[in-house]
Amino acid sequence: MKVAIVHNSEEKSKQVTKQLTTLLEQNQIQIDNRQPELVISVGGDGTLLSAFHRFNHLLNEVSFLGVHTGHLGFYTDWRDYELKELVESLCIHREKSTSYPLLDVRIRFRDGKPDKHFLALNESTIKRGNRTMVGDVFIKDELFERFRGDGLSISTPTGSTAYNKSIGGAVLHPSINAFQLTEIASLNNRVFRTLGSPIVIAHTEWLEIKLQESDDYFVTVDQLDIYQENIASVCYRIADERIHFASYRHMHFWHRVKDAFIGED
């Protein structure tokens, strides 16, 4: 097995990475940061997002696994004190993997530039600096509403527990092959009206946000900020690609949710 390790800049994560590398080498597991079969992130969820974007060109060939050293690790199955057990599992057990949906993001421009294409594991947002964003929301090429407010968030099921949850979106089980549109501080009064509720969109449907002409929009894809001029619209759908997580031990999704947000009684 060939393994790549991605860690954050925290000293604890660097120490854990050093220990993990030693254990892997002692067990004849090859470190390969170019063509790995397994990518191990050491840190928190942000580190795993970084690992995903670093290796998302190899999604059909790699699985991901997280070692938790931070304050919140929704994607991380292993703790930093379980390294020996983790390496033993890599050596003994045949890997099983669980796959989750990803978000296909396509930015279209007014000036004829080629579309820009991205994959998101958690979410993508559209905002407009310090001014009110105005955008027409199309579902399957039909106008659904005209949105006015701070912005829009479009999230995957696994991303539903991240930024989406903090702005009032629903938590979706990752087995649901769909994505979610959640408003960010929408304007709703007698003149301007939106649905005002999160919308769950099936994988067979697609979403396009057509923006009023302006040069101060910015789009995020997970932790990446993408500032672009002349954006005409942003299109979203469930991607053909999926992310695979190595599953050497099972943790029920709702147990993860409880552990991350509620804790023990």
UniProtKB/Swiss-Prot annotation:
It is an enzyme of class 2 (transferase). Keywords: ATP-binding, Cytoplasm, Kinase, NAD, NADP, Nucleotide-binding, Transferase. NAD(+) binds at residues 45-46, 122-123, 148, 150, 161-166, 185, 223. One of its GO terms (cellular component) is cytoplasm. It catalyses: NAD(+) + ATP = ADP + NADP(+) + H(+). GO terms for biological process: NAD metabolic process; NADP biosynthetic process. The active site is at 45 (proton acceptor). Gene3D superfamilies: Probable inorganic polyphosphate/atp-NAD kinase, domain 1 (3.40.50.10330), Probable inorganic polyphosphate/atp-NAD kinase, domain 2 (2.60.200.30). It holds the Pfam family NAD_kinase_C. GO terms for molecular function: ATP binding; metal ion binding; NAD binding; NAD+ kinase activity. Its EC number is 2.7.1.23. Its cofactor is a divalent metal cation. It is found in: Cytoplasm. NCBIfam families: PRK04885.1. Belongs to the NAD kinase family. Involved in the regulation of the intracellular balance of NAD and NADP, and is a key enzyme in the biosynthesis of NADP. Catalyzes specifically the phosphorylation on 2'-hydroxyl of the adenosine moiety of NAD to yield NADP. This is NAD kinase. It comes from Enterococcus faecalis (strain ATCC 700802 / V583). The gene is nadK.
